[in-house]
Amino acid sequence: MPSASTISVISAISGVAVLGALLTATIIFNDINRFYYETMETFDEFKINEKNAWDTMVMSTRSPKEMLLGRARRQAALPDCQALAKNCPPGPPGPPGAPGAAGEPGVDGDAGAAGIDGVAIQFASAAGGACIQCPAGEAGPAGAPGAPGPAGPDGQPGADGQGGAPGPAGPEGPAGDAGAPGAPGAPGNDGQPGQNGQRSTGTPGAAGAPGPQGPVGSDGQPGSAGAPGAPGPAGAPGVDGQPGANGQPGPDGEQGHDGQPGPDAAYCPCPARSSVRQ
């Protein structure tokens, strides 16, 4: 059993085919009507031209003799009751007479020879030959409306309009999300070497308060030997005595002079000028 989608597709195709057939039939019907009206207009024009040509040929085939004989017959039909004149001079012209009675219709002329084909007439007209000039006939009835013509080409694009006035400023939008941290910048170039600092000796500050007593120092060096005494009498050797106690430490020596400044070390900050040498 076909599915619903297959039935829908078949129905759509059938509908399109029916619409196409109806559209084609409408176009063919319009073409047939247009061809019929064009053919009838051509046929009516041909009949008018044929009638005008026949009338012109009939008028041109009547000879002057037939016209005169017909006039003589009309004059002979009138009564002749007056006396005949004998060598009388002509009198003055009389007044115009009354209009005569209508003459009898003339005899129909013989049928004219068959005309040349239409194509030959066109060639004769182009060559400068004599052609029958037929008066234009009455305007025929209005034809049926023709089929709509095809859509014309697109027009040229119009000129750009004048620029509008600037619109009012819109409300301030919400703050955007924080951006990602930027990449670390490249290391900067080395700066110029700084100028050499000025060397100076600070003024010694005031003496501070005495500090606490420090721990006992280590034993001092043995004192220098005394001057040799006068030789005494040799006594009996005595017993070795106990070692004597250590002597008191000697006083501190004087402070030495300041040493010369040492050479500059590696790159390091210079000491502040207000520093005090201890």
UniProtKB/Swiss-Prot annotation:
Record flagged with keyword Disulfide bond: yes
Annotated segments matching region Disordered: 84-109, 140-278
Residue spans of biased composition, Low complexity class: 99-109, 172-228, 236-245
Keywords for this protein: Collagen, Cuticle, Disulfide bond, Repeat
Pfam families: Col_cuticle_N
Domain of life: Eukaryota
Transmembrane spans: none
Region (Triple-helical region) location: 91-120, 137-199, 202-264
Compositionally biased spans, kind Pro residues: 89-98
Family membership noted in the UniProt record: Belongs to the cuticular collagen family.
The protein's role, per its UniProt record: Nematode cuticles are composed largely of collagen-like proteins. The cuticle functions both as an exoskeleton and as a barrier to protect the worm from its environment.
Protein name as catalogued: Putative cuticle collagen 91
Gene source species: Caenorhabditis elegans
Taxonomic lineage: Eukaryota, Metazoa, Ecdysozoa, Nematoda, Chromadorea
Designated gene of the protein: col-91
